[in-house]
Amino acid sequence: MKSLTLEQIIKLHDDIINKTSGSYGIRDNKMLKALVYCPFQTVFNKECYKTDLEKICKLSFELVKQHPFIDGNKRIGAHILLVLSKVNNLTFQYSQKELSDLFLKLASSEYNYNNLLNWIRGRVMNVK
């Protein structure tokens, strides 16, 4: 799977804040670093998140829930979902309202990781 570095994620976050307003900065640098590697963790030499889609959803979800940035955590979570899907040749159909509603539900804990994964699986057109 093609992934993003910590520096790339921070740059994307800064770009989002530039375009949409809000506060710059990282609230918890150690947490952010951990989140970047979270989708690739193993237990007893077995991947916790086996598919590209599971890894992408895990990073996106944790960016929203763990709130590593001062502002824009839902926005960067959604953007990472879209960017990583694109660079890994995954396409899915959605409306902007559906995506916005999804990330609001994630942030409010109305939805969890499995809800996000199932939402994407229901809309994905090609899965690795």
Regions found by a protein language model. Give the residues of each.
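FIC/Doc superfamily catalytic core
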Residues: 1-128
